[in-house]
Amino acid sequence: MTTTLLTGARVWDGLADAARDGVDVLVEDGRITRVEHRIEAPPGAEVIDLPGHTLTPGFMDCHTHVTVFPQITSALISSPTAQALQALPVLRDLLHAGFTTIRDLMTADPAYSTLDLRDAVARGVVDGPRMLVAPHLISARGGHGDFSGTIGDQFQGPGRPLELAAADGPDEIRTRVREEIRAGADWVKFGATGGFSSPSDDPEQVTYSEQEMTALVEAARDLGIPVTPHCYGDEGVRRAVTAGVRSIEHGNLAGPGALRMIEDAGIFLVPTQYTVLNHADHAFDAEYWATSPAFKQRKFQKYQRQLLETAEHLAASEVRIAFGTDAGMFPHAENWREFPMMVAHGISPVRALRAATSVAAELLGLDDLGVIAPEKTADLIAMPGDPLTDIEVTGEVDLVMKEGTVHRRPAAPSA
């Protein structure tokens, strides 16, 4: 049995308003067994001293794309094997940055490479966060997940349908849902609205009818699988919430009424603010957009004010926010930047940290994670300083423990 004593840090348990001083955490055989003042190290235990650090639960990112990169075209014309190989260092870097759990919400290949990556991590073949996976974005033809119009001229791979997981009408949608679940999906994701990165639609356009959304959610629910939609505007939110989704991805154009509907339904919002609001902040900066498609900049110019207003409304609401980044739309391993973006737009540091720990665990149905308490799985990270007063230190994680195994530790003090 492996035993580790973590001592000398302030401990924030994932729930409280403040961290506690002078508290030690004992980990035995992958689980937290004691959280107390001044624990005496058991014989044979490794002692990790963390002066000046804050110890927290491992972070969870509820919206990643580990096989996708900012220039999505390169992923679309790569083989599933190439995409999986490119994801290996991404997974390692995510873990070393303190993200011990991720929910991956779409690969850009028609196969199921992210399910294979999930299983490889679970078996210990690959170092990385534990993964929950929605393999593809089920999308209406011509919607956000139909890439036919994006790279048709560059398409080279035989048998690589650019429609990926396109489905229209209740019957075809049910079939597509069942195919995802048959392959091993933990979640089902669908496109409720258009998006910013797709050239043929608009973020406020609703791409599935109420009947189609209801058929999709019911097909997944019958098989015990939760559903989440890519969704920006009010009408998409209204239809998705009515259909019975578990969370809303993005929601960055939702007005106060739509946010209240999310709150009243008791579901979660994953606002992916770094990728969206960073673009909005630079909507009229020509240099910032020099290497990006013109249509994408035009969309952010059109919606800049509304995006910033929605962020303000969200901060003032009581919506249950879960942390998610849309990483892959920006460089991987910079997921921590979501924290300061949330805080810059009115969300308190403790609410942002809960979003990535206890609230994320609730969304993902992972009761053993997200808090530091006896009998919980030992997913623990530490960073110098105090993220409750300086959120930027979330980018300086230097201790990472997943299931009791230390994957990163602070550098030894120089002599």
Label for each model-derived stretch:
Residues 53-125, 141-145, 211, 235, ...:
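Metal-associated gating/positioning segment near the N- to mid-region
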Residues 9, 356-358, 362, 374-415:
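C-terminal cap of metal-dependent C-N hydrolases
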Residues 70-73, 114-115, 144-145, 198-199, ...:
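Histidine/acidic-residue-rich catalytic or RNA/ligand-binding cores of hydrolases
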Residues 116, 168-269, 286-290, 300-320:
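Histidine/acidic residue-rich metal-binding segments in metalloenzymes
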